[in-house]
């Protein structure tokens, strides 16, 4: 699994990286603009991400806006809905508007409120078919 972690908080970023490195390679972005650039570069190199874990509240471009831009790029690339990257949004806020925006505007696959348990994330990766069942 090839993942992109988009997180401005160092500790949160390191925790996600430690979890996801067990399952494959991870790239890091610290804001939404870097995420968009990393997403484009991965496609240019014919090595698209399988998963993006993206924080919502970040500097430069927030996670919601970055996700909408990534979804637009996927449309521009002519991707079908079954070819788009799986995105898990993460946030410290349990805000209903943010949840709705993540799912309906950004078509996120899942949404986690920090802090969350490692087992929860691994279970969700299996549900999303990014990891094999045991």
What are these regions, as identified by a protein language model?
Residues 7:
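Conserved acidic carboxylate
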Residues 10, 21, 28-41, 63-66:
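Helix N-cap/capping motif at the beta->alpha junctions
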Residues 37, 41, 64-83:
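Short amphipathic alpha-helix used as the core "switch/output" element in two-component signaling
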Residues 43-53:
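Active-site beta3 strand of CheY-like receiver
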Residues 58:
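Receiver (REC) domain active-site loop signature in two-component systems and cognate sites
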Residues 65, 77, 82-83, 94-110, ...:
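Alpha4 helix (beta4-alpha4-beta5 surface) of REC/receiver domains from two-component response regulators
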Residues 113-114:
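A Lys-centered signature of the CheY-like receiver
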